[in-house]
Amino acid sequence: MRHNHERKIVTFSLGSRMFGIDMSLLIEIREWEAPTPLPRVPSHILGVSNLRGTVIPIVGLAERLGWEPSRIHARSCVLVVSLGGQQAGFLVDEVADIVAIDAEQVQPAPDVEIAEPGVIAGLVQVALRGNQSGAGTMVSLLDLEALNITGQLEAAA
């Protein structure tokens, strides 16, 4: 593997599906804490939280992708990311691992499960920590910018 094509991704689950985002977007992983609700926002925007003096939107990622809302449980957490100079938090079911992938192994993704093209940037097979079978897990790479969360918040204001 040539290291100049390698990048790190944070993998996480939403229901039975495994997703990944580029590690360079991640600011921190926070335990779930119910956000303060906002009026007149799309239902996938769960509210806002205060992150060391900065108010950030908390997005139900499953809802934003058009699926059933995530059920809150002990491993639920929020991925705080930087998108276009703004911060946002995404509720996920569980963080699985941080893995290095070879960019050349990323396969194009068919837009069959998500109504918006471009949200799934690709698919990659990865070996996740704790996977006893030794088989790789298919991970859908999300393009968080394509979700246009910051634009939706500005429109709701």
Regions found by a protein language model. Give the residues of each.
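An acidic, low-aromatic, low-complexity terminal/linker signal
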Residues: 1-157
